Curated annotation (Swiss-Prot):
1-deoxy-D-xylulose 5-phosphate binds at D9, H10, R45, H50, T99. GO terms for cellular component: cytosol. This is Pyridoxine 5'-phosphate synthase. Its EC number is 2.6.99.2. It comes from Desulfosudis oleivorans (strain DSM 6200 / JCM 39069 / Hxd3). GO terms for molecular function: pyridoxine 5'-phosphate synthase activity. The keyword Cytoplasm applies. It is found in: Cytoplasm. The record marks E150 as: Transition state stabilizer. Catalyzes the complicated ring closure reaction between the two acyclic compounds 1-deoxy-D-xylulose-5-phosphate (DXP) and 3-amino-2-oxopropyl phosphate (1-amino-acetone-3-phosphate or AAP) to form pyridoxine 5'-phosphate (PNP) and inorganic phosphate.
Length: 236
């Protein structure tokens, strides 16, 4: 059974836009869980543009399964060791990007990533790596000691033509196949919506989808409960 993890970052984005204390991403997380979400995701960015440190602590307490997305930095490593999420997903981070633009480049940054993985594993925190759908990056993830990968689906979701979308889908399919053959847990996310998910669910080897913006956007119109249930219906 493929699971759904709901990212609540953009509930916090709406809150931070006005500098108030609502809407509360923790309340959104609770509603998502009640609707059937299998996990809650939050990305604590270095610039704290949406999720804040206190959100992470409260989400850890409220979520049945909490996934922390974070950059490979000493500060974030310290926070992860304190909070002890159920899973850490290591992601690249650029200050000026609107959202994460690509996967980790393990050919360039494999050393620091492997060191962080070792530290977190030593403290019984499983680690996934957010990577582009590239077999080489999948193999490097395995070599670095990751137990899971999250395949970046952004290029597929943003494809301008059907031909490009099919090409990107084939890249994802190949990456998933390589990851499975290496014994990795395979997750996927970034840009997935109620339309693009229909392609992704044909890849039965994917263990979990991480979806945030499209669910939060739909929730603004129909409520979190229905938004999550509608996505779960498509996944199942």
């Amino acid at each position: 059974m493929t699971h759904l993890a709901v990212n609540v970052d953009h509930i916090a984005t709406l809150r931070q836009a006005r500098g108030v204390d609502y809407p509360d991403p923790v309340a959104g997380a609770v509603l998502a869980q009640l609707a059937g979400a299998h996990g809650i995701v939050a990305h604590l960015r270095e610039d704290r543009r949406h999720i804040q440190d206190t959100d992470v602590v409260r989400l850890r307490a409220a979520a049945r399964r909490f996934i922390l997305e974070m950059a490979v930095t000493p500060e974030m490593e310290k926070i992860a060791l304190s909070v002890k999420p159920d899973l850490v997903t290591l992601v690249p981070e650029k200050r000026k990007e609107l959202t994460t633009e690509g996967g980790l480049n393990l050919a360039r940054h494999g050393g620091p990533v492997a060191k962080t993985i070792e530290t977190l594993h030593r403290n019984e925190i499983p680690v996934s790596l957010f990577i582009d759908p590239d077999p080489g990056q999948v193999r490097r993830s395995h070599d670095a000691g990751a137990m899971a990968v999250e395949i970046h689906t952004g290029a597929f979701c943003e494809a301008a033509t059907e031909k490009i979308r099919q090409k990107e889908f084939d890249r994802i399919r190949k990456a998933v196949e390589v990851a499975r053959n290496l014994g990795l847990i395979v997750n996927a996310g970034h840009g997935l919506c109620y339309t693009t998910i229909e392609w992704m669910v044909t890849l039965k080897e994917i263990d979990e989808f991480s979806i945030g913006h499209s669910i939060v956007s739909r929730a603004a119109l129909v409520g979190m409960d229905r938004a999550v249930r509608d996505m779960l219906a498509l996944i199942s």
